[in-house]
């Protein structure tokens, strides 16, 4: 009985540690041609080939960027950012570069 309680206690502590580990990878979106993927990781937007490889960071602001969405032609990426205090919509070239603010929230 004592062995069972120790096993259960260890299992519960392992599970609770896993449950509070933050999931930094989110907002995954596949390009219209299916060749590339954009995603958010720790508040920045990254792009990677769908076939695999090293991800390229597209944003590097102190702000939090999220919800990247491809334009229908795959040439631009729209996303939300709190660069100016509140979340606004921005658009940038799919290969990175200067983002243009679309809304003034």
Stretches with model-predicted labels:
Residues 6-11:
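Sec-dependent N-terminal signal peptides
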Residues 14-16:
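N-terminal signal peptide c-region/cleavage motif recognized by signal peptidases
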Residues 1-4:
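Positively charged n-region of N-terminal signal peptides that target proteins for export
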């Amino acid at each position: 009985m004592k062995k069972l309680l120790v096993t259960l206690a260890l299992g519960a502590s392992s599970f609770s540690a896993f449950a509070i580990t933050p999931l930094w990878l989110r907002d995954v979106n596949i390009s219209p041609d299916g060749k590339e993927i954009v995603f958010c990781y720790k508040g920045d937007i990254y792009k990677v080939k769908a076939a695999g490889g090293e991800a390229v960071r597209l944003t590097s602001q102190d702000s939090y960027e999220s919800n990247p969405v491809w334009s229908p032609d795959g040439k631009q990426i729209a996303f939300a950012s709190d660069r100016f205090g509140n979340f606004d919509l921005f658009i940038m070239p799919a290969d990175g570069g200067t983002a243009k603010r679309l809304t003034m929230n």
